[in-house]
Amino acid sequence: WISGTTKVKARADNTTGHVWDEDLQEMNNPLPRWWVYLFIITVIFALVYGVLYPTFGKYQGVLGWSSQGQHQAEVDKMQQDIAPIYARFNGLSPEQLAGDAPAMAVGERLYMNNCAQCHGSDARGARSFPNLTDGDWLWGGDPAAIKTTLTQGRNGVMPALGAAVGTPEDVRNVAHYVMSLSGSPSDSVRAQLGKAKFTACAACHGMDGKGNPALGAPNLADDTWLHGWGEQAIIGIVNSGKTNAMPGQAGKLTEAQIHVLTAYVWGLSNKPAPAKP
């Protein structure tokens, strides 16, 4: 089939003699030469490719190439190119960077590329995603706490406490007490009854309901309701608990990038002093 010296014996009418469905015959037309050559080239290419690149099991190929390695090389090249930009920010504190227009321009781009998907382009968040422009912080709002959050991430867990609180009526009473802490409309009688049962919640939120940043326990005495407001929303959280997570960015952003992003996030809820010329 390579040299073309072996051919199927053809009849006078250029058929192989095979007939189907009474009149369907197989013609003795050879494959085009270009098709045969292309097939041979394809086979050779596949063999060479299989030797050079990863193909079977743990075989890594002669070149040692991988898509992960190529991606990392491109990331390293990019980090090398932008290193001079961040070098001028390294000696400044987050508070100082927050007043530096060029640094905040970089910080805004970092935020839009890595944070806006959850917290929104205006940083005002959404249900279950905190508003970064107010003064309400689950884990602390100083630059050090923000940098820790960005670097390591946070895991917030509110255990289901319905059984610990008591009966469904007890849970409802606690919900009204929680609403009363922030001055929200509530049943004063139920709120008074729920106060005694609130001790099951006070271990994290405190007896005054103002929360504990060390635990990520929200302040229940303000008007910020991250996971929904109202009797039914609070009852649902008390009975079922709540889990929320903020992914760490250390594996995605460099330390210098996190430093600038910290300043940007801190500046969203603070008024930084303008940078000195």
Question: Could you describe each region identified by the protein language model?
Answer:
Residues W1-G99, W139-A145, T149, A160-V178, ...:
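Periplasmic c-type cytochrome electron-transfer domains
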Residues T42-F45, S121, G156, M207:
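Hydrophobic alpha-helical transmembrane segments in multi-pass membrane proteins
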Residues L181, H227-G228:
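Gly/Thr/Ser/Pro-rich low-complexity intrinsically disordered regions
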Residues S66-A103, A116, G120-W137, R154, ...:
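His/Cys-centered metal/cofactor-coordination and adjacent catalytic loops
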Residues G99-R124, D134, G140, K147-Q152, ...:
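Sequence/structural segment immediately N-terminal to covalent heme-attachment motifs in c-type
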Residues A126, P130-T133, T151-V171, V178-V189, ...:
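Axial heme c-ligation environment in periplasmic c-type cytochrome domains
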Residues M27, G120, D134, G162, ...:
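Residues marking the start of alpha-helices
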